[in-house]
Amino acid sequence: MVLLAGTANRRELAVERAAKKEAVESLNGLFQTTSVAIVAHYSGLTVAQMQKLRQQMKQAGASVKVSKNRLAKIALEGTDVAAIGPLLKGPTVIATSSDPVAAPKVAVEFAKANEKFVILGGSMGTTVLNVDGVKALASLPSLDELRAKLVGLVQAPATKIAQVTTAPAAKLARVVQAYASKSEAA
C-alpha cells in the first residue's frame, strides 16, 4: 500500500514538473518577443479589477501575466528584460508589450485609479526603469501616433512641392485670361 501511494506522488510530481517547465517555456517565449516589461504589486485587487486590467491591456496590444516569481525569474534568464528579476518579490504581475508605450501607459493609468496596484519598475530592452522611468515612458505618444506624425511630416513637403510646381502655371493662366479679357474689352 505504501508503495502505491509513493508511486502516485511521483506521478503527481512529474506532472507538476512538466507543467512548471511548460510555464517557464511559455514565459520565456513572451519575454524574448517583448520590448517592454512592467512589474507591479497587485495585492488587494479584486477579481473584477484584475479582469479590467487584463481587458485594458489587451485593448492596448499588451498582456498581463501572473506567475510564481521563481518560475518567472528562471524564464527571464537570457532575455533582454532579465533586469526585472530583482523586482519579483511578493504578489507581482508582469505587463508586457511589443509597443514600448502600450503596457506602461495602461499600467500607469490603472495605478492612478487603483491605489492597491503599485508599479515597482520595469525594463525596456536592456534598460532598467524605475517607477519614474515607467511614468515617463507612459507619457510618450504610442508607436501608432508617432507613425501618423511621421507620415504627416513626410507628406507635408510633397504637398508644398506640388503647390509650388502648379503655381507658375496658374499665374500664367491668369495673365493669359486677363490679356484675353482686356483684348475683348478694347
Swiss-Prot record:
One of its GO terms (molecular function) is structural constituent of ribosome. Keywords: Ribonucleoprotein, Ribosomal protein, RNA-binding, rRNA-binding. Gene3D superfamilies: 3.30.70.1730, 6.10.250.290. GO terms for cellular component: large ribosomal subunit. One of its GO terms (biological process) is translation. InterPro entries: Ribosomal_uL10 (IPR001790), Ribosomal_uL10-like_sf (IPR043141), Ribosomal_uL10_bac (IPR022973), Ribosomal_uL10_bac_type (IPR047865), Ribosomal_uL10_CS_bac (IPR002363). Pfam families: Ribosomal_L10. Part of the ribosomal stalk of the 50S ribosomal subunit. The N-terminus interacts with L11 and the large rRNA to form the base of the stalk. The C-terminus forms an elongated spine to which L12 dimers bind in a sequential fashion forming a multimeric L10(L12)X complex. PANTHER family: 39S RIBOSOMAL PROTEIN L10, MITOCHONDRIAL. Forms part of the ribosomal stalk, playing a central role in the interaction of the ribosome with GTP-bound translation factors. NCBIfam families: PRK00099.1-1. Belongs to the universal ribosomal protein uL10 family. This is Large ribosomal subunit protein uL10. It comes from Rhodopseudomonas palustris (strain ATCC BAA-98 / CGA009). The lineage of its organism: Bacteria, Pseudomonadati, Pseudomonadota, Alphaproteobacteria, Hyphomicrobiales.
